[in-house]
Every structure is written in C-alpha cells, then in structure tokens.
Amino acid sequence: MLVSAKEMLDKAKAGHYAVGQFNINNLEWTKAILLTAQECNSPVILGVSEGAGKYMTGYKTVVGMVNGMLEELNSTVPVALHLDHGSYEGCMKCIEAGFSSIMFDGSHYPIEENVAKTKELVAICAEKGMSLEAEVGSIGGEEDGVVGRGECADPNECKAIADLGVDMLAAGIGNIHGKYPENWEGLSFETLDAIQQLTGDMPLVLHGGTGIPEDMIKKAIDLGVAKINVNTECQLAFAAATREYVEAGKDLQGKGFDPRKLLAPGFEAIKETVKVKMELFGSVNKA
C-alpha cells in the first residue's frame, strides 16, 4: 500500500540518514526499485516526472501499475509515489489519480504567487493524507524543459515556504540535474546550514543526486537533508548495460532478442545502482 512520505522523512531527518527518491520510467524501472527496496529493507520514494507520466500514458496508469506491483511482490517496506517537479495542474491530476505524495515546483513564480499556490495545495494534501514538497530557488540543469542554473535559495524565502505547512523542502544549494560540468563549484554548505537553522525539523531535499561526491552527500545528510533524488545515474547504468548486451551480439544469439532478455542487464544495473545509493544514504534496514 502506498504511504505518504512524511513519516519516513521525519524519521530519516531525526535519524541522520536520507531516503532515496528514484524516478521511474516504465515497468522495468519500477520493478527494479521496488525489489531492491524490499531486499535492502529500506523505505523508498518512486518519483514520476510529468514527462514520464505522459510517456506511461498518464498518472492513473502509473498508480495502477505501482499498486499492482506492491501487491504481487508482497512489498512490506514503506513506498511513496511522488510527482517530481509538478506544475500546479500536474499536482491536481496526481491528487485525483491516487498518488501519495506530490512536489509543487513553484520556483519560477514570484515568491507571492508561489506562496499562494503552495498554501492551497497544503490544505488539499492535509485533507487527503498526502505529503507535499515545495521548492525554493531553481535547481540547475534541465528538467522536462525547465532550465535552471544551479542557484542558491534565499534562506528567508525557504522559511516562508516551510512555515506554510509543507512536509519537505527542496532548496537550491548549487546542485543541478543531470551530469555535473567539470567546472562545477560544489554544494554550498553555508546556504544549506543557514536554511537548516531557519527551518528546524523540516526534512530538506537534495535534487540532482547523480554525480555529487560521496563526502558531500554525507555532509548534506548531516546538515538536514533527508531525501535525495536520483534519476540520471539509473538511466546511465541502464543504457550502458543495454549497449553492452547489444554490442556483444547477444540479441542475435538464440532468443536473445526477447525483450525480457534484452532488458535484463539494464534492469540488474538499475538494481545495483539503487542498492549502492541506499547504502550511501544510510536507509538500509530503516523500513
């Protein structure tokens, strides 16, 4: 059964570990992440971008697939299904479809409008028992066509949004989506610390978890990050394993063209990536 992400993240913040949000793109992705969470006895958040939701034909399809898998796999660990970087309209659709958590990305609105829309969603989510993530300061890189350049959020704006009653807060601290450029300056721990001081027990979210050095990840968790988003790394692992299979000519041997065989190496690569991340984040055996 899907759960709100609130309880798992409050526990993570108090226990100085982080829960991974791993984005799903199809059945293989979802199955790989759910199986790994069960094997690691770890809570997990399945992230769905608006683009991925559209690709999977819509949010109701996603909810049906995830709920069906949870039942068929006899999953016992806490699992949240979360809209990633949702527009206001996307949030409304996911609330209706049966998601257990949403992120409203109002970072491109003026702060007053971000506050007004967030307030409205806080009330709806509280009524439905869903968790809500808000964002302040755009995260760098490109996410479904929205480009941000890795800026640092204003800690006072973070406090203003946190005080509205959201369950978790994503704040830009120099992080970006996708591969990090060679001249990346690293995370701003000064900004993170200032945000943490003003937002107290609020679980903080680190987007763009791919490619951030392990020591920075651990320090971010120490400073209050309780949710870390990973997407690109799983995609790269899946692509590399699939390419290796095809380049070795395995799709031409026997029934190697069978999609279940063709996609198996990529599936295993996602599992391994997720396992390594759960170990790094400290969420193993925290279910």
Positions of predicted regions on the chain:
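Alpha/beta enzyme core
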Residues: 3-11, 15, 27-52, 57-76, ...
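Poly-acidic low-complexity segments
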Residues: 4, 23, 154, 188, ...
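A short N-terminal beta->alpha junction/helix N-cap motif
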Residues: 17-25, 50-54, 261, 265
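Short catalytic-loop micro-motif centered on adjacent basic/acidic residues
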Residues: 19-23, 81-82, 103, 204-207, ...
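Active-site proximal loops enriched in glycine and acidic residues that flank catalytic Cys/His/Asp
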Residues: 173, 208-210, 232
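C-terminal alpha-helical cap/extension of soluble enzyme domains
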Residues: 213-287
